[in-house]
Amino acid sequence: MLFRSIAYGKAYAALSMGRPSRLVLQKQREKPVFMENLMDLADGPMFLEAGGQLIRDAAGEVIGAIGVTGDTGEMDDVCATAGIHAAGHKTCADFTDPKVIRGINVKEAKPQISTP
């Protein structure tokens, strides 16, 4: 039963932070105090280890997340990616736009210029 909780925590970390869980782990290592405070605010359990991936459609929009556990974090990531691709979807790594790779997919608006 613990495996299910770990997988859920990886998926939740990816979905709530908008990036693969391995990048959330990296951010935790870079800014531990910030991430500790952020995790206190989270609505669910985040498990910070590789294996949580965002599921994206062809346009790069997030449509869900998956968490995989049972092997090393790196192999869990490989399995998550394989499952996403087998289902016909995409991961952050399938896009070259840096905003999508970081887990952000925003539609940029043109700057509004107001004149007096």
Task: Explain the meaning of each model-derived region.
Residues 5-35:
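A charged amphipathic helix-loop-strand protein-protein interaction module that recurs
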